[in-house]
Amino acid sequence: MDTLKTYYSKRVQEYESIYHKPERQHDLEHLKQMLRSLSSGQSVLEVACGTGYWTQGMAEAATSIIAVDNVAEVLEVARQKRIDESKVTFVKADAYDLAPLVGSFSMALVAFWWSHIPKEKIPQFLRSLHGPLTHNSLVVLVDNKYVPGSSTPITEWDSSGNTYQTRTLSDGSEYRILKNFPKETELRDSVESYAEDFDYKELDYFWIATYRVAK
């Protein structure tokens, strides 16, 4: 099991504590409302759904959601939430190999996963992500900005330009976690061959990028 997967399996009981930071509540409410609006009437693929924090809100508006994660422990928590099971299916799947998923989707949400992708693996992830999507599908990327005093400090850089944080869980265990904070131009360049109508917005603590899948 890789470090990131181990970390999230161990963090499962405190997974959503990050959403309790007082200074981020306004931004989080904005994101919830935005995702409910964007997912209305959509067939959604949610990548790296974690404990279903974002799934729960979208389920009120979406036609259907396939929510995938590669960590069994967080999926167990997600399945315990009050979510319409006729709309939402949680699936254990690898974000880098979404080919086994059955069906096509009119929207994909990648929330707080892009920052964990090593820069050298972004092309592989994008090939995987776009496999189940169709022309004009909406792709929504949401992730953290680096905000001094609120974000966990960066403690390491590697030769590929990836940045790392040292994260400590409530049991005192420490993990070296890859966490990148891309700029708009880097995101735009990464998805350029797949995207049309690219749009990028920044909130105080988060960024949001959307685009339509090009022909």
PLM features: what roles do these ranges have?
Residues L45, T51-D97:
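Class I SAM-dependent methyltransferase SAM/SAH-binding core
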Residues V142-V191:
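C-terminal alpha-helical "lid/dimerization" subdomain adjacent to the S-adenosyl-L-methionine
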Residues M1-S39:
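Conserved class I S-adenosyl-L-methionine
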Residues F112-W113:
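Short catalytic micro-motifs in class I SAM-dependent methyltransferases
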